[in-house]
Amino acid sequence: MAAAADTFLFTSESVNEGHPDKLCDQISDAVLDACLAQDAESKVACETCTKTNLVMVFGEITTKANVDYEKIVADTCREIGFVSPDVGLDADNCKVLVYIEQQSPDIAQGVHGHLTKRPEDIGAGDQGHMFGYATDETPELMPLSHVLATKLGARLTEVRKNGTCAWLRPDGKTQVTVEYYNENGAMVPIRVHTVLISTQHDETVTNDEIAADLKEHVIKPVIPEKYLDENTIFHLNPSGRFVIGGPHGDAGLTGRKIIIDTYGGWGAHGGGAFSRKDPTKVDRSGAYIARQAAKSIVASGLARRCIVQISYAIGVPEPLSVFVDTYGTGKIHDREILKIVKENFDFRPGMIAIALDLKKGGNRYLKTAAYGHFGREDPDFTWEAAKTLKWEKPQA
């Protein structure tokens, strides 16, 4: 066991699918799914905002698809659980505003030449820099603090929808503080220091009932017993009342939960949101391939922890830069690992879309829009499949 002086605390948070910002992410990605299902070449930049009894969908979409935006809004809200004004929004009676224009032809010609370019020649949809991160502290190769916060939120939704905790409402937030030990650059979780859950609830339940149910039905099934001890702190609905929630409690907007979507504050973030964007937007596709690269490095045993950065210029296929850091945990020098990354991954946007099958619709992107884009066991999350890396090992 590490001495107390050698440990530190790190905190990650998450929000439920009923949080107003996450509602907007899900509507935007449901629109993207609908477009791609009918037209794999759809160019989508679809924002959503919401407030009491109102959802507005707006942005730029160029597609051959016939999209019923009002139905997508209603179906998404209903599936989350927004079915009456008292829970924050009524899916079947809220006002829906749609303001959609086509993608700028200036952007279109620079990025994909109005569909005349080969996949390997498709330029990045914008400038920017993206990061992928992986760590060996969990089976998912994700940070434990982030994994636990995310799973607590998902469990809140599960016990709400299956009736285990019928007093729950859709909105809610979680936060987990983990005590860590830095083992020569690798992160080793020691214990869970603090668990915070703030969840929307109905009028009838007491705070004591909320605390008891959250401990029994949410925390115990999610957090391994080995991480909990007599000193673990629990803050369960500490404000004392959370009846008003969803868009009634707070306005929501697509793209405001980018740290929750990624690594919970670990690694780094280039600033670009994922939801609402088709695969030509490297904010999304670049971050996905960077995660696969970082995960493949850790899964292969080349490092215990790894971050990968890539950067782009609008209209240019090749990345401007690729960077790798293993935080001192690499089995070989980082410059050799960088060579391996470059040899095994094609970072051109058109080739990323092919390698990760990113033009497929259905409900693929909707699934990413709540409970994290990374560390998920789902065949649609193709970037989570670690590649078997090929490289020429240096001669002894």
From Swiss-Prot:
GO function term, MF aspect, one: metal ion binding
Class of enzymatic activity (EC top level): transferase
Highest rank taxon of the organism: Eukaryota
Residues that hold ATP according to the record: H19, D171, G172, K173, S239, G240, R241, F242, D250, R256, K257, A273, K277, K281
Keyword Transferase applies: yes
Pathway: Amino-acid biosynthesis; S-adenosyl-L-methionine biosynthesis; S-adenosyl-L-methionine from L-methionine: step 1/1
GO biological process: one-carbon metabolic process; S-adenosylmethionine biosynthetic process
Enzyme Commission number(s) of this protein: 2.5.1.6
Matches recorded under Gene3D superfamilies: 3.30.300.10
Cellular component annotations (GO), alphabetically ordered: cytoplasm
HAMAP family: S_AdoMet_synth1
Protein purpose: Catalyzes the formation of S-adenosylmethionine from methionine and ATP. The reaction comprises two steps that are both catalyzed by the same enzyme: formation of S-adenosylmethionine (AdoMet) and triphosphate, and subsequent hydrolysis of the triphosphate.
Name this protein carries in UniProt: S-adenosylmethionine synthase 2
Organism expressing this protein natively: Dianthus caryophyllus (Carnation)
